[in-house]
Each structure stands twice: as structure tokens, then as C-alpha cells.
């Protein structure tokens, strides 16, 4: 943690400098590779970690080495991870999916924006300095057409997005030849079906069944296709966004790029402060990952923060505004029903979801049913026209472990299952949001309830936090629950940062939250038995046993921290080749001793073998050649 706290002016200047000097860059000793597909224009980016060779013998003067294979890994950084690509935040990213969208012939450009709010913002000359200069002309489905990946999947169509995902999910493991690296323990998948090889047809089938979603708004062509579903790699979401008291457009774009660098599969923009519309445009035009929002936050800003003044018309206009900007998924709190609100009265911590509390207050003040529930079919019609996925929000999630798994939480979950089937009628993709604060012994029930009542739609949870006693360390308390529920079948984990319950996260907090959750997601993939998940672990263990320090750093989720911790006590270059670390020193290193034991055992085997051969030679009378019948 920095000893000197930066002023707001300094924070903005630092963020601006980051944006102005941004270049594509790879992690240490890594390079960007692309795997091509059968469909034209499908090139899937991955990061390949280059490893040093293993010393296997020879002399000091003429050592003998054995090459180690490069390790391919999933890469969320988009163009920011490719040193060959010129980055210009002012222009935004290349529109990767635009040719695929255009080739389908089922969309049309809008001559005028559908949202009154968007029209007003575009007409305001005072916003010119804040506005992203290359605003896209939005597209919408042609009349009578649906443009969702779910619709295509149900029609039996394998889209370029699906083929891209199939290659990406396999993580290039077909390139690995070493049996040591390919070894993997059997997993326990709790009913998930994990194929040995993920094909584009498998992706299509999972999407068609509603078990997976591909968040890919037709107005966000910059995004690289990814999938959320329990039969795929567990994904991680990072939250960013300004508030009424802090953060700027520059800082939010910086956090976006930073998030994708550290492994965010999706990013949610939860801005609640000024210039929400403009901030979101900058984020979308520069995001290689899907972007989600909670539209009720901006709708509330439009009525000056007074929940009672919210209307369906204001909310509908907000949906159109965001859909035409390119938001890939909406969190909609349509399951907070009027009759469920009294169920929270005896809770220790009441309703802790911002969206849930807004809708609960509206329901009570008007004594009417939630207008999101009442107008849900109209919401689905909007989503179907742009391919916006729905993330059905858990507005009644528990905010403390005392309130976990209560009547209100599961009543809402069952309603979300009802809404899922309605959304599917419109070919709208759906995932379900989950808690929250849940002690370990109560976590699995959340997964089984969701699978049963929400028809196996992907589950997306915030943690859950497994204890409430650790403010400042809630990335740990929730990472434990995240690993567990990911193992049980949760498809995406929403990260928690060290600032949870305390304040708005900065760059370092974002990184800490993401690393914690990438660990949780990877641990879940290992436990489920996702094919190829153990390759990187095996490569790390091999490098560790062989004292290949540089490879250990480079294989780490965070190479920079691994190197820094090592160099705190052994900063010299000789420390990078030493057969010990500062924990045990040269005399007590268990791995060094293990190597010596292995070498000794091998030598003993040779010596015993030679003795046996000598005895056998003497027993045959010392003859060099044997007759054929004796051989």
C-alpha cells in the first residue's frame, strides 16, 4: 500500500498518462499467438508462456539440456496483450465481429436513436469534450428477425462466435505433447458434462439448451466471443464504475484495461455518478470483453435519486440507450416482488442489494407489483432486438451469513426460474445471479436450488462470502466460497476486492480481487476435472522441482509479485539459478534433498544392476559369446 495518498487531481493525471502511453504488451517471457479456425476471419488469441530447458546431464563445460514445451493459456487482454497492435484509446478497438454480424444480413442501421435521453446527450454541445469521438451508428434486428446467439443455436447454426469459443475453451492443450504435463487427476463434476474436446457443435448445443450464454450485443463488435456455462471454464467478472463522490472517465477506462490484463472475462460498469452515458461509451469502444450494467442505477439518476419517481417509461428508455451503445448484459431485478419484501423484515441485515432495495422501495411506496416484473416481456423484446443477455438479479440476496438461504432469498430464486422460461420464449439468453453471504456448509444448496428451479441456466454469484468478520480481507472470505460454488457448478464468479464494504476500489484493489478470483475459478476447474486445467500446474511443479526460478515467476498468475517476493531476500542474479530459496537455505531445501535422493537411487540401481551382470557373467564361465541355445 502506498505511503502517500494521491490527490484527486494526481489520480486523474496518472490515469490520463496511462491512457496516453498505453501500448500492447505481453507478460514476461510470453508471446501472443493466434489459432485459426475453419470459418474465415476467426483467429483466436492466446498467450504462450515460453520456458527454459531442463539441465539433464553433461559437464560444466558441455551441459546437456532437454527442451520444455511452451504453455498456452487463456488470454482476456484482447489487443492490449499483443505488442504488435498499436493502441489508441481515442479511436477504440478494431471491430472484430462486425463482418460476422453484417454477413448474417438480419440487422439494420438506425437512422435515429431510439432513446430520448441519448438524443438529448448527443445534442448537448457542452459534452463535446467528454464525448468519445467515434460513436457508432447503432444496429437493431430487422423487423420480424431475432439476432441472438440463442436463436441461431436453436436453428442449428454454428456462428463464428461459437467456433471462436470452442478453440478458446480448449486453451491450445492439443499443442502439449508431454505426458507429464498432460497428466490430470479425475474431477468430481456434480453432474456437469465436460467433454474431452470442446467442439463448436458442443458450444451450439449448450447455448441452445440454455445451459450457457454468449454475451455479444450486435453493437459491441469490439468484443472477443466468450461463453458462460457450467460445462466450460469458470469465468470471473470485475466491477468498475464511478460514483457520485469519486472517479473519472480516464480512471474507469484505465480500470477496464487493467481488469482485462489481470484476467477479467467480463466487466460490469456500475457507474452511479456524473457522465454515466459518456463513461460507458468510452468503456465499450475500448473493451475486448463483454460489458454488463445494472440499468436501474442510471434510471434512478434520471429521476434525481428518488426511487418513488421511477417509471417504466424512464427505465425502458434507459434499456434502449444502453442496448444501442452496446451493453452485452443487463442485470434486471425483476424477481423482487411486493409480497416478498415483508419476508426480509426479520433479517439481520435486510435488503443489501442496491437494485433490490430500489425496487423494494418503489413497490412499497406505490403498493404495486414490481414494474420490471410486470413489463418483463417488453424487456425481452428489447433484448432480442440487440442480443443483450439478461442477468436476472438477486435483489433479495443475504447480506450476512445469518440471513443465508432464507425464505426471501429462495422465493425470489424460484421467480427468476419462471422469468427464465419467459425470456427463452423470445430467444433471449439468461443467467441467474446468486449470493452473497453464505457459510460453507450452506453453499451447495444454493447451486442445487438454482439448477432445479432455474432450469440449468448459468449461475453467477458474488462470492459468496463465508464469514463476516474480515473487512479489508473480503477477497479472501469470498474467494473460499467462490471456489466451492464454482466446483459445484457456478458458471461465473463476480469478484470481491479488499475494499468490499469499505470503499470504491482502486487499481491495486481491482488486481487483488481478480487474482484471488482467478485462483478460485482455476481451483474449481481442477476440482471439476475440466480437460487440460492441470497443465499449467504441472508445468509449475516441474519448474519448481528443477529450480527454474524464471519459469516459476512466468508461469504464475502474477509474475511480478512472485519475482518481487523472491528478490526481497535473494536479489542477485545468482539467486535465479540457485538450487534453494531463502525459506530453507541450501542445506535444508526439501526439493534439493529429493533430487539428491533420486540421483542416489538411480546410481544405486545402476550399481546393483552392474553387480548382477558381473555375477551372471562369472556364473556362465566368463565366456564373452554364448551359444544360440544358451542366449
Curated annotation (Swiss-Prot):
Q: Which InterPro entries match?
A: ThiC, ThiC-associated_dom, ThiC/Bza_core_dom, ThiC/BzaA/B
- Positions that bind [4Fe-4S] cluster: 581, 584, 589
Q: Quick one: which residues bind substrate?
A: 239, 268, 297, 333, 353-355, 394-397, 433, 460
An annotated Gene Ontology molecular function: carbon-carbon lyase activity
Superkingdom of origin organism? Bacteria
What is the reaction catalyzed?
5-amino-1-(5-phospho-beta-D-ribosyl)imidazole + S-adenosyl-L-methionine = 4-amino-2-methyl-5-(phosphooxymethyl)pyrimidine + CO + 5'-deoxyadenosine + formate + L-methionine + 3 H(+)
Can the keyword Iron be found in this entry's annotation? yes
Q: In which pathway does it act?
A: Cofactor biosynthesis; thiamine diphosphate biosynthesis
Q: Which cofactor does it need?
A: [4Fe-4S] cluster
Q: GO CC: one term?
A: cytosol
What family is reported? Belongs to the ThiC family.
The protein's assembly and partners = Homodimer.
Q: What is this protein called?
A: Phosphomethylpyrimidine synthase
State which gene encodes it: thiC
